[in-house]
């Protein structure tokens, strides 16, 4: 089977990518041996659009990928995305957001060093501080492209206004947002992120396309999440919201059974059916789930099934914020105007 694809800039990548975050952050520990095995299996499958960040494991994720490049010699097979924006105070360990041009250059050089490469395919602003005008940020990133250190520029969790202003300075190749049957906020007219991306021919890269695993049907109680797992803190998965939100999962499970696929594959196939500009990046630490997720590329949903899932989403009331208090304030961020 030829692998369905999506466009990032002038490049063609698999229509389902691999989110590397879970190897080092949010969902508990994983061994180096297991991480390297998953990366190799992803490459062998043809799942070669990888997504990292300098924040995942505070550099450990990039270093792990760098070791894989060095050990396998397969750098050229991978379209690699990573991100900057979070700065860690070396003395206090406190995190803050920094989008200033001098910090961008510093963060990029550190990422290149950790990865052991001289150019990153797609470099995202991970989160916005709300203090630096997007025009300044894009100007700095444009210089990084011209220097040959990055190939394409991406944004993440920003406002529609920020997307439009950014695209007026230099092409934006991807915007990364949470998008799934469980999180449809980007479609809302008052948020307008999907509309802004489509106006500017920007690929929408979807993180947490399985609702952080919730849409797979694997979790039937809040107690099913391991100790130290991010979902134990996120409001959407708390006891007071969990069972109400599970109603949508139950509907998706039922539709998946009728189509002889897993709930996760149904969710991913439904996302892909939303447009040729939609590119989900599910993450996992296990080869079994990697194969299941990438297998969603073989699924072709009927128009009736796509409509049935849309109706289930429309009739579901998803309750609880995506992030714990504090972190959620950096969602759909705007940036200040350029000083006159």
Swiss-Prot record:
Active site located where?
Answer: 56 (proton donor)
Residues the record lists as binding substrate? 126
UniProt: NADP(+) binding residues? 208-218
- Record has Nucleus as a keyword: no
Q: What is its EC number?
A: 1.1.1.-
Q: Where is this site: Lowers pKa of active site Tyr?
A: 83
Cellular component terms, GO, for this chain's entry?
cytoplasm; cytosol; nucleus
Pfam families for the chain: Aldo_ket_red (PF00248)
**Which family does this protein fall into?**
Belongs to the aldo/keto reductase family. Aldo/keto reductase 2 subfamily.
Q: Which PANTHER family match?
A: AFLATOXIN B1 ALDEHYDE REDUCTASE, ALDO-KETO REDUCTASE YAKC [NADP(+)]
- Can you say what this protein is called? Aldo-keto reductase yakc [NADP(+)]
Q: Which species is this UniProt entry from?
A: Schizosaccharomyces pombe (strain 972 / ATCC 24843)
What's the source species' lineage? Eukaryota, Fungi, Dikarya, Ascomycota, Taphrinomycotina
